Amino acid sequence: MSDNLKSYQDNHIENEDEEIYERSNGKGKELVDFGKKREPLIHNHEVLNTMQSSVKTLLSSLGEDPDREGLLKTPLRMSKALLFFTQGYEQSVDEVIGEAIFNENHHEMVVVRDIDIFSLCEHHMVPFHGKCHIGYIPDQKVLGLSKLARVAEIFARRLQVQERLTRQIAQAIQAHLNPMGVAVVIEASHMCMVMRGVQKPGASTVTSSVCGIFEKDSRTRAEFFSLIKSNK
């Protein structure tokens, strides 16, 4: 198994505020936050008021009048939108998976592909969007199919970079299901490459994260890549 995808279950850290797993990557320790379900910040009036004030300051800094008709409700709308786009911080993988792990004595590959994902690049806070493909080989236990998409959604709804998002999805499935292997591929278009910078519409970024048998066995890995490309 590569340094980037060690087992995450060996060193479980108890923390009252959030579920955190510690893994060794060969260069020290990395904390992997699987989250804890919390009251949505969108219902926190203090947070909303602070964010609205900040948005008004941004609008004024752009030379706009935040009190003109078209912008009067923009601070509230933008604040609520940002909280929705980042609601993954308030969600827990444990809560999402719940009791949807089933003993099926199944050992063949399971693939859910073309999961739509939307996220915000943490560098410019502009969107990137695309498709996520998830595959795993169960060790008897299988996960409800919709839960794979929900796990991807938890990590996509945070400030992200695509490489980390791909890795976190794989880590969460590995840690909670303990399968024989996990593979995740994300294909995405980044607005920071379309609307600014190099301004190259049509460019896409592909990232992958594999562990277990997908890393050790090239034939298994090739089967996964073949399945996510079939009939396209």
Swiss-Prot record:
Protein's pathway: Cofactor biosynthesis; 7,8-dihydroneopterin triphosphate biosynthesis; 7,8-dihydroneopterin triphosphate from GTP: step 1/1
Biological processes, Gene Ontology terms: regulation of G protein-coupled receptor signaling pathway; response to Gram-negative bacterium; response to oxidative stress; tetrahydrobiopterin biosynthetic process; tetrahydrofolate biosynthetic process
Role noted for this protein: First enzyme in the biosynthesis of tetrahydrobiopterin (BH4). Catalyzes the conversion of GTP into dihydroneopterin triphosphate (7,8-dihydroneopterin 3'-triphosphate), which is subsequently catalyzed by 6-pyruvoyltetrahydropterin synthase (ptsA) and sepiapterin reductase (sprA).
Enzyme Commission (EC) number: 3.5.4.16
HAMAP family: FolE (MF_00223)
Binding partners and assembly: Toroid-shaped homodecamer, composed of two pentamers of five dimers.
InterPro entries: GTP-CH-I_C/QueF, GTP-CH-I_N, GTP_CycHdrlase_I, GTP_CycHdrlase_I_CS, GTP_CycHdrlase_I_dom
Entry-linked PANTHER family: GTP CYCLOHYDROLASE 1, GTP CYCLOHYDROLASE I
One of the Pfam families matching this protein, by short name: GTP_cyclohydroI
Region of interest called Disordered, as start-end residue ranges on this chain: 1-24
UniProt entry keywords in alphabetical sequence: Allosteric enzyme, GTP-binding, Hydrolase, Metal-binding, Nucleotide-binding, Tetrahydrobiopterin biosynthesis, Zinc
Temperature notes for this entry: Optimum temperature is 60 degrees Celsius.
NCBIfam families hit by this protein: folE (TIGR00063), PRK09347.1-2 (NF006825), PRK09347.1-3 (NF006826)
Binding-site list for Zn(2+): 121, 124, 192
Protein name: GTP cyclohydrolase 1
Catalyzed reactions per annotation: GTP + H2O = 7,8-dihydroneopterin 3'-triphosphate + formate + H(+)
One GO molecular-function entry: zinc ion binding
Top EC class of this enzyme: hydrolase
Superkingdom of origin: Eukaryota
Record-level GO cellular component terms: cytoplasm; membrane; phagocytic vesicle
Membership in a protein family: Belongs to the GTP cyclohydrolase I family.
